């Protein structure tokens, strides 16, 4: 089955793909794509079920990957935010001819907390799932607030996220539920050692969804990767510290 996803392409140079997170769409990358298009050929996608791809649906990371493969550039730098980080990591693991370098942003190989592993408490994810069935617009708004919490520019961050989501068709509830299931169940920790391309992990020090301790734990699980912590950011460093964020990507691309 072919699944035509919505892509926007701008700029010239090395191919760079930007992948959004849960409940969002490609419009969250608008400022980032604009800034990076002076340095790269930037590809921004709406994942299946989101934005202008809202009529599509994918129930697993591999189904998302198959949809992306239809139009994704080969040998590109992949930048995945939050849930998009799982998507980009999956691409690097299973479709490596498409990925020359991997960047994860405020992401984790396992989002749900378990034992000593830090993350989102399973009951929070369960509550989100229950709320989603009742009122998915309100649930997305709560998630936006949760993402920005702790950031000095939280109010502005939420405003931009909200504008981005509302500027395109609302996500489909089926895909939102599938995404929450991925956040609750996917665990790529043991697979990280098999990533064969250079990897950069970017974090926000104030992030409540991907705690800073995850960055330290991953130094052991992915010792070959590089990591950088944005001091003033929560879950959306590409908004809170936009200039520094783009600088990290440009420097990593040229290394």
UniProtKB/Swiss-Prot annotation:
Binding site for substrate: 22, 82-83, 143-147, 235
Cellular component GO terms, alphabetical: cytoplasm; membrane
Record-level Gene Ontology MF annotations: pimelyl-[acyl-carrier protein] methyl ester esterase activity
Ranges in a coiled coil: none
GO biological-process terms attached to the record: biotin biosynthetic process
The protein's Enzyme Commission number: 3.1.1.85
Subcellular location per the Swiss-Prot or TrEMBL entry: Cytoplasm
One Pfam family it belongs to: Abhydrolase_1
Subunit: Monomer.
HAMAP family: Carboxylester
Name of the protein: Pimeloyl-[acyl-carrier protein] methyl ester esterase
């Amino acid at each position: 089955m072919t699944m035509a996803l919505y892509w926007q392409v701008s700029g010239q140079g090395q191919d760079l793909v930007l992948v959004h997170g849960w409940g969002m769409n490609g419009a969250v990358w608008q400022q980032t794509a604009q800034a990076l298009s002076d340095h790269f050929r930037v590809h921004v996608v709406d994942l299946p079920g989101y934005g202008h791809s809202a009529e599509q649906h994918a129930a697993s990371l591999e189904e998302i990957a198959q949809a992306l493969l239809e139009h994704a550039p080969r040998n590109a730098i992949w930048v995945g935010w939050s849930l998009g980080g799982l998507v980009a990591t999956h691409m690097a693991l299973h479709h490596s001819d498409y990925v020359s370098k991997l960047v994860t942003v405020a992401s984790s190989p396992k989002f749900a907390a378990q034992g000593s592993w830090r993350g989102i408490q399973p009951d929070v994810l369960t509550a989100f799932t229950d709320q989603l069935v009742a009122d998915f617009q309100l649930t997305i708004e709560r998630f936006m607030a949760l993402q920005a919490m702790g950031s000095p520019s939280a109010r502005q961050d939420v405003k931009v996220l909200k504008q981005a989501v509302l500027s395109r068709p609302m996500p489909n509830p089926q895909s939102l539920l599938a995404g929450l299931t991925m956040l609750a169940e996917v665990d790529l920790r043991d697979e990280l050692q098999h990533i064969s391309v250079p990897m950069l992990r970017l974090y926000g020090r104030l992030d409540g969804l991907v705690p800073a301790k995850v960055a330290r734990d991953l130094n052991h699980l992915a010792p070959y990767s590089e990591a950088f912590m944005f001091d003033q950011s929560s879950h959306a460093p590409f908004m809170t510290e936009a200039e520094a964020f783009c600088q990290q990507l440009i420097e990593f691309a040229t290394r």
